[in-house]
Every structure is written in C-alpha cells, then in structure tokens.
Regions:
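Non-catalytic, polymerase-adjacent accessory regions of viral genome-replication enzymes
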Residues: 1-70
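Right-hand nucleic-acid polymerase module
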Residues: 1-16, 103, 108, 112, ...
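Conserved phosphate/pyrophosphate-binding and hydrolysis machinery centered on Walker-type P-loop NTPases
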Residues: 58, 62, 137, 211, ...
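Short Gly/Ser/Thr- and Asp/Glu-enriched loop/turn motifs at secondary-structure junctions
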Residues: 86, 243-247, 279-280
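Conserved pre-motif C helix in the palm subdomain of viral-like polymerases
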Residues: 97-128, 207-235
Length: 374
C-alpha cells in the first residue's frame, strides 16, 4: 500500500466519521413534528414577547398565543407557511447607516424555533471555537479576550517579530450569496422538510443575494457562513492565532512574508466562495505596531503586556453631548442628576479597557461644567 493510498484511506475514514456524526445530530432533532411541537412553539412564542410587551401588536399576539400557535404549527406541518412582510427602517449607528428588516412577531416565533432547534445544533459543531459572534458564552468582549491571548501567545514564541493580517468583508449581509447558503443547507440539514423551511427563510429576500439585518435565522446563518474559510485557516494552514467576529478577521503570523502569503491564500479562497473582500480595510501590519480590531485599539508593549483601548470617537461624542446638556440644564429641560446618570454609560464602556485616563477626563469635564462630582 503506497503512501498516497494510505492518505486516501485516512481521508475516507474521516469522511465516514463526519457523515455519521452529522446523521446523528440530525436524528437527534427528530421529524418536523417534533421540532415544531406545540410545546416548543408556545415556549419560544413567550420568549419573543420579552422586552416588547408594551407594544400593542405583542399584547395581541400573547392574548391569542394558544390559538395562534396551533394555527401557525398547522401551516408549517402541511407546508403552506410563508414568511410575511417585514417592517423596513434604517438606523444610524455610530455614523454607520444600517438597513433593518424587522419581522412581525408571528414570524419571529417561527424564526426563533428554527434557529434554536435546527440551525444552532447543526451549525455550531462545524464552527471554530474562535467564532463566537451571537453565540451563547461569546460576544464582542469574548473576542477581545481571545485576541489578547493570541497576542500574548505569539509574544512568548517570537517576541515582537511577526505581522498580522487583518481582513474585512464588504457588504457582508447585503451581498451574501444565496447559493452558498443553500449549499450549506444541503450538507447540514438532512431532513427535507426542515431544509425546505430553512430555504424559505433565505428565499424571502428577492434577487438571490443578501440576508436581512434584524432576522434571527439570518444572523445565525451569516455567523456560520464562512466556516469553510475558518477551517482552512485553522486546520489546513495550521494558524493558531486566528479568529473572526462576523465580517472582521485577524491572523497572526511569525513574519511579514508569511502574512502576505496567507493573505493571498485567504482572500482567494473567500472570493472563490462568493464573498467580497474589502481591499481598503484588509492589510498586513507589523506585530509591534498598534492596530484596530472591532473599533478597539490593541498594542503589545516591549514587555509583552497587551494594552486595549476603547473607541476614541466615543470621547468626542461624550464631550459634545456634555456641552449640549449644559445648555439644557441651564434652560431647565434636564437636571444635573439626569446628566450624571447618562455619563455612567461612556464611563462604564471605558472601564472595560485600559482607559483610566479617559474616565478621569470625563469626570473632570463633568465637574468643570456642573461643579459637582459624578
């Protein structure tokens, strides 16, 4: 038996084990009648009401939850359920305009069951540990801690030598290819009824591209979408210091040449998948220089300490708002106590980072304006 034949045999054994595990995960879900059981739909229907019970539509939904759940479950089981229209509006978040498509609460009930009972159990096992956006036990600050750990690990081996490759996707949600999502469904969801339902949610966006912001299955689909790229970086390229948060990637390499070679490989693989790479934000930076990841500034000192600073634009906004509130307090529209309560928001944000100096500056500015301590 040649080495090539042994390699092929090992590959086939791995494929067989993966297929067996995938089948076991799908068998654990059960048929569509068990996944969308009345109990599960009622439970997640109540979950949808949390935090929005002041809305009239939510109150009507909860008032008729018993009968409405039975009606929607009947439509799902006989294959006549279709996603309804969404309420479209735009948000301007820190200067970034984001189009939001909010589904009706009746559709949110179905979406939540699909996400919690189907997409999460089937997608998460194929995702790397360093992909924890919108996942239980994860989040943005989880990724800050992981990046700090990866920087310290690299420093212990290579010191300040090396480089980072930072990558960002362009229009990650608006230009998501539906064909890639359907391909993932065919590989992950073996039950044809559940796969058809997941395809319906994707097909609700016309044009064959794009996933809406504000829809729960959309968020889970997009988190897991680049999993093949993640596994290529982690498994095939064997890069320990690599992770991504939604559309933001970083990889830590021992040299600038290795970072440039990895950048070409990763960008080529991403574009082959149909994902658009933002060339303006994708770059190679020296390990010894500070860089930004998800609006936070990271820097490794000569002693190996990792310093993390919050977004500096927040200080500009806080100072501008304090001067605005000064005029409102003078006119009687606000009280000093209300301003002090608001100031806790930027202070609490910067207390998560190595920004004690910025916290002191905000407190001093508040004292200079209102002659009292916060």
């Amino acid at each position: 038996m040649t080495s090539e034949q042994r390699r092929e045999a090992r590959y086939r054994r791995r494929q067989t084990r993966r297929q067996a595990k995938r089948k076991a995960r799908n068998d654990a879900l059960g048929p569509i009648e068990e996944v969308f059981s009345y109990r599960a739909m009622f439970f997640y229907g109540r979950k949808c009401c949390n935090g929005v019970r002041w809305k009239a539509s939510t109150q009507r939904f909860e008032m008729h939850l018993f009968s409405g759940t039975a009606k929607r479950r009947r439509k799902i089981l006989n294959g006549t359920w279709r996603p309804g229209k969404t309420a479209h509006f735009t948000l301007k978040e820190r200067g970034k305009v984001r189009p939001i498509d909010a589904p009706h609460i009746e559709d949110r009930q179905v979406y939540k069951v699909l996400t919690k009972k189907v997409l999460v159990p089937l997608n998460v096992p194929s995702m790397i540990y360093d992909n924890k956006a919108s996942q239980k036990g994860g989040g943005l600050h989880f990724h800050y801690r992981r990046l700090a750990k990866h920087l310290r690990d690299h420093y212990r081996k290579h010191g300040l030598e090396g480089a980072l490759f930072l990558m960002d996707f362009h229009h990650f949600f608006p230009d998501a290819p539906h064909a890639l999502l359907y391909e993932r469904h065919r590989g992950m969801i073996l039950n044809p009824d559940l796969r058809q339902l997941a395809d319906l949610v994707v097909a609700a966006v016309p044009g064959g591209v794009g996933m809406p912001l504000g829809v729960e299955p959309s968020q889970q689909e997009m988190v897991a979408l680049p999993s093949s790229l993640d596994n290529r970086i982690k498994a095939q390229l064997s890069i320990h210091g690599a992770a991504h948060y939604m559309d933001d990637y970083y990889t830590i390499l021992p040299s600038k040449q290795a970072a440039e070679v990895t950048a070409a490989d990763v960008i080529g693989h991403a574009e082959a998948m149909g994902l658009q790479v933002n060339a303006g934000k994708s770059k190679v930076v020296p390990f010894s220089r500070p860089f930004r990841f998800c609006k936070a500034k990271f820097q490794v000192t000569d002693t190996g300490a990792v310093k993390i600073h919050g977004c500096r634009d927040g200080m500009k906004r806080a100072r501008r708002k304090l001067r605005l509130f000064q005029a409102r307090v003078a006119s009687g529209e606000m009280t000093v106590e209300q301003v002090a309560q608001w100031l806790q928001t930027p202070i609490s944000y910067y207390e998560n980072f190595n920004d004690h100096g910025r916290v002191l500056k905000l407190r001093r500015l508040f004292y200079a304006i209102f002659k009292t301590e916060v």
